A protein has these predicted regions:
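Short hydrophobic targeting helices and cationic amphipathic motifs
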Residues: 10-13, 17
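Short, positively charged and aromatic/hydrophobic N-terminal segments
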Residues: 18-22
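Alpha/beta catalytic cores of nucleotide-metabolism and tRNA/nucleoside-modifying enzymes
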Residues: 23-41, 95, 107, 127-131, ...
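Non-catalytic, usually N-terminal nucleic-acid engagement modules in DNA/RNA processing proteins
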Residues: 23-131
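Glycine-enriched alpha-helix->loop->beta-strand junction motifs that scaffold or abut catalytic
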Residues: 47-49, 73, 102-104, 156-162, ...
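Glycine/Thr-rich beta-alpha phosphate-binding loop at enzyme active sites
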Residues: 112, 141-212, 216-218
Length: 233
């Protein structure tokens, strides 16, 4: 669900306008969050369908769209809605929704910036639900380099797909900004984190990666030579 904050500066407008050009050149799959009325039309501009689990029972037309997306040969990524809810959707209910929607991929319930709880949830979920349809996406979580590094190592070994978020607090320390802007810290912070994984020799070039959200579209030019970064929402 690509979201851009309103800014007075021209460079932010340029950032937005250049987004489609950047992503077309890189071949990263993109899905924008859209109003329900535009879901059908979104097939024309979204490379895949990104489904928020907490909306499935709130909006019948929302559920209908995603339940029948495969008729149109669409990839569907089912999110556990942790960003929207502040905590992951109940694991048992989430598994039921996976069985109902039959997504191409689904994000296993995680815990915001908590590596231990995320890995515990991942292990419990994968042991409890062994025959769900679709590929498993594990999210990297943590507050420090060591936590994020260790979580990445485990998730990249155990999940089918690795997700890295755009707004870890860690980025506010490692990122750079000429204007003390949080968006710039997040943008450069995730770039640096991925560079660190590559420099340490642990980045899995043989496994697809998903970028959860973004702050500034300029970030993605940094990944032009990293085809393992496959998608963004």
């Amino acid at each position: 669900s690509i979201k851009f904050c309103k800014r007075r500066h021209f460079n932010y407008l340029f950032d937005f306008l250049s987004f489609d050009t950047i992503m077309t050149e890189m071949k990263i799959k993109v899905s924008h969050e859209v109003p329900i009325k535009l879901l059908e039309a979104s097939r024309q501009f979204n490379d895949y369908d990104y489904c928020l689990v907490h909306l499935l029972d709130q909006k019948p037309e929302y559920k209908h769209y995603y339940k029948y997306a495969k008729v149109y040969d669409r990839e569907v990524l089912l999110d556990n809605s942790i960003f929207e809810l502040g905590k992951a959707f109940d694991s048992k209910e989430f598994a039921k929704k996976v069985e109902e929607i039959e997504p191409t991929y689904y994000i296993i319930p995680d815990s915001l910036q908590n590596a231990y709880e995320t890995l515990t949830n991942f292990n419990n979920f994968t042991k409890e639900y062994t025959n769900l349809p679709g590929l498993k996406i594990g999210v990297v979580q943590g507050r420090t380099w060591n936590e994020l590094f260790q979580c990445y190592q485990y998730i990249s070994e155990s999940a089918d797909y690795v997700a890295i978020s755009f707004d870890y607090d860690y980025y506010l320390t490692t990122g750079e900004s000429t204007t003390n802007d949080k968006l710039e810290f997040w943008c450069s912070g995730r770039q640096r984190f991925i560079d660190q994984l590559i420099d340490r020799g642990v980045f899995r070039f043989d496994k697809p990666h998903h970028l959860l959200g973004c702050s500034l579209a300029r970030e993605f030019k940094h990944y032009v030579d990293i085809p393992a970064i496959r998608s963004v929402d």
